[in-house]
Amino acid sequence: MSGPRPVRAPRGTEPSALGWQQEAALRMLQNNLDPEVAEHPDKLVVYGGTGKAARDWRSFDAMVRTLRTLKQDETMLVQSGRPVGVMQTHEWAPRVLIANSNLVGDWANWEEFRRLEALGLTMYGQMTAGSWIYIGTQGILQGTYETFAAVAAKKFGGTLAGTITLTAGLGGMGGAQPLAVTMNDGVVICVDCDPRAIDRRIEHHYLDVKADSLDHALQLATEARDRRKPLSIGVLGNAAELVPQLLAMGAPIDIVTDQTSAHDPLAYLPTGIAFEDMADAAAKDPAGFTTRARESMARHVEAMVGFQDAGAEVFDYGNSIRGEAQLAGYDRAFAFPGFVPAYIRPLFCEGKGPFRWAALSGDPADIAKTDKAILDLFPENESLARWIKMAGERVHFQGLPARICWLGYGERDKAGERFNDMVASGELAAPIVIGRDHLDCGSVASPYRETEAMLDGSDAIADWPLLNAMVNVASGASWVSLHHGGGVGMGRSIHAGQVTVADGTPLAGEKIRRVLTNDPGMGVIRHVDAGYDIAESVAAERDVRVPMREGDEAHEGDAAHGSGAAREGDGV
């Protein structure tokens, strides 16, 4: 009988599948469920409250079995964590196509999703859980680091030294926050209701210390701030209680955000319920639990707004807590901005986003060599060099060794081709898997996060992630995914992902060049279409073809030369 057991990706240079593309998908699926990586591997939950890698253990076994026998001209189809077919395609086609959690508009809500999930018909794939490219907390670390660096540049003279940040949530995503703040030389208090999450972040060196109480946490924070010493402090408790308490205490907080699992009310602990009773309470009365969770979120957000009124820099970190608080009746829920319009969108306009890779060999030396390759490729990028150096020194690998760094249009393809050459020459022991978060410049429609406050009002236009998925299929990605609801919950986002394998072959090189050009290119054209000047400049400088812009240029040229004048070649 298929059921829970420890899962770990194979290491080494010998594939058990019929090709490295299939082997890569197999190893990354298994890596997502490695106990070092997944939050609740026995339940197939990788991160984000309920984000799963497979619908059930029987489906997991079927995917493993199928990937091992999949031919070089075949494609496995995965419907919400279950393999539903194998089709003959061709060598340029993806080996796996994945669709997770997608529901028709009027049915796209948590209640209907849970009804269908209970029937065994779907699963919640989050972003990289169901698309098999989660690499542990490092996966969000640089984005979090860059966000806090942007906060520092905006308000604190380029450093967080001498500041205290308050946040909550130390799960797979939120667990990046303490290290991201201390990398920017700041002090941070991190609240979580799960003692295991706090202990795990300390074990993985993302969190420095655990406070005995809220008063103790504040004492540690102020002492470190006064010495301008970086320090991250975990404190056990319910954010809906502790954040308002800190506000009432007049705590000297400079920055406030949140990464609890607010996107799913059943994953947010209401006040008055003990953490140990949370799962039973949610299962027994999901509607009542949801109401109580939203009421608690409203108090949490009200306190965040209170800190903003007191002068703190406050932002939503993309977990939909503002929307949930608004549903509970709090009318100032959107008084503070989301992190993308506040800090990240200029990077998106340049086609920049979270480029990540993993060493299928399992050898950390392969990542060290790729780190050096990145530094050699982009010697002028000082912030990238600082990140790679810090990551090499401070990031704990979870599962297969991996790295993330933000690269833009015209950079990702260079990195991918270099990695492929290194595999071909034998410098790397085994192929490299290259992917990204779905949180990227041109792959998401999410009005509460990535596409919040778009210049042209196109926040909810969902054509872009669909086009992104299709162009990655057409370009030769190894597997492509199209999900709904990741990050912010059902009905609030549609997003796509791609993974491409550098196996050292000339064919892989051709695929890499296309995928890693076209994928970030979608970010450039999406922001050109929305009217962003930065994106317009990038498109012009780097020869990104945008037909509507070409039409405008042609029209301007005609006007300049006289539209009625005969021109050479017109046949007149």
UniProtKB/Swiss-Prot annotation:
It is an enzyme of class 4 (lyase). Its main location: cytoplasm. Binds 1 NAD(+) per subunit. Pathway: Amino-acid degradation; L-histidine degradation into L-glutamate; N-formimidoyl-L-glutamate from L-histidine: step 2/3. InterPro entries: Urocanase, Urocanase-like, Urocanase_C, Urocanase_central_sf, Urocanase_CS, Urocanase_N, Urocanase_Rossmann-like, Urocanase_sf. It comes from the Bacteria. PROSITE patterns: UROCANASE (PS01233). GO terms for molecular function: urocanate hydratase activity. Pfam families: Urocanase, Urocanase_C, Urocanase_N. Its EC number is 4.2.1.49. GO terms for biological process: L-histidine catabolic process; L-histidine catabolic process to glutamate and formamide; L-histidine catabolic process to glutamate and formate. The keyword 4Fe-4S does not apply. Belongs to the urocanase family. This is Urocanate hydratase. It comes from Streptomyces coelicolor (strain ATCC BAA-471 / A3(2) / M145).
